[in-house]
């Protein structure tokens, strides 16, 4: 959505944001990425697909980011290839620049992870 000031000039609602680049590791595919960083926080909004098999409790290191974060953790939605429906709850961890995904219920049927996670960037100091 575009926003304009009283003089008709376009303005940014969030100043100083940077897009975060996510690179999937071999065996994984990036479905979408709307992730960005401010001066102190990273907002990870992404979908990752496991190409061969499904997510399990043993999955780790599914992708890398071009920013470094302090530890972040959140639940994530898990689905399968039939549609965009979330069928199960998994977990997402961010450690340094690594994204870790796992199926906390070990259903053995979910190959897509939908991540919405906020964590602090490692260079931010109070």
Q: Where do the model's predicted regions map?
A:
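Extracellular jelly-roll beta-sandwich "head" domains, especially the C-terminal globular C1q domain
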Residues: 29-31, 48-64, 72-126
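Extracellular receptor-binding modules and their adjoining Ser/Thr/Gly/Asp/Asn-rich linkers
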Residues: 1-61
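A short, structured loop/turn motif at beta-sheet edges
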Residues: 36-39, 68-72
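Short, hydrophobic/aromatic-rich segments at coil-to-beta transitions
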Residues: 13-19, 70-78
